Amino acid sequence: MKTTLALSMATLLISSSAFAADFSATKDKLETALAADIRTDKEVARDRNRKPVRTLEFFGFRDDMKVVELMPGGGWYTKLLAPVVADKGQYYMAIGTSRASKAVAGQAGFDKVKVTAEEAKIYRPEGSKFYALEADGLGVSDMDMVLTFRNYHNFSESGRAVMNKMAFDALKSGGVYAVVDHTRRHMQATDNENRRRFDPVLAIKEIQAAGFKFVDMTDLHYKPDDELRYEVGRKSVTGNSDRWTLKFVKP
């Protein structure tokens, strides 16, 4: 019994050490990306709030992964993810990629960035506060990770279902679906103040319904001063919104 326990502990320690060593190389590359000239002063100013290194470590991001970022916005995370995986992995951006593509076009170290699911359509139906999403898939498979930051709230229920299915189909077994968004109170009805927030319990329910296993969450982006009452774009809330950070795995 003691021998078995000792062996188990030794295995755990070795695994933990290997995990730390694996991320050490990735962390070094992330630190280099964080210091790169391509990043604007406004982007750098958000580092303290967004905690990208710790967030990506939580998700299990590594420099040899094939990753897809959904709706990369202006490319804040693109400028960190793409150079880290450039040598040993692959970065794809998908859905609403025009601003991010423009931000890194022609820049040294970003020539391997690929755009996928270019046929995807995002539109807001007349009278709706949320976007619809039409797409056959992400156009890639066997991915290690699909990430999306502060986008889940933008879509209608059917749009979210499409997005979750796209992520599921693109990932390999064991692949990670990493999702971050602004927190809304559980079961709170939608209004103009919370429209860009989302209930994390509902997110978990929907993503599990797509076939994913919910494996972990972190309070890295917990903000006790956010009353969850006001629009995230308000001056008093911007940069200080409470955000849920959820990790799912494809079985």
What are the roles of these predicted feature ranges?
Residues 130-133, 154-167:
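A short, conserved alpha-helix within the catalytic core of class I
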Residues 210, 225-251:
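Core SAM-dependent methyltransferase catalytic element
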Residues 190-217:
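Conserved Class I S-adenosyl-L-methionine
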Residues 91-94, 174-186:
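Conserved beta-strand signature within the Rossmann-like core of class I S-adenosyl-L-methionine
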Residues 63-73:
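Conserved class I S-adenosyl-L-methionine
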Residues 82-83, 161-174:
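A short glycine-rich, Lys/Arg-flanked "PGG" loop and its adjoining helix->strand segment in the class I
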Residues 136-146:
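A short acidic, Gly/Pro-enriched loop at the edge of an enzyme's catalytic core
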Residues 26-63, 76:
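Class I SAM-dependent methyltransferase Rossmann-like catalytic core
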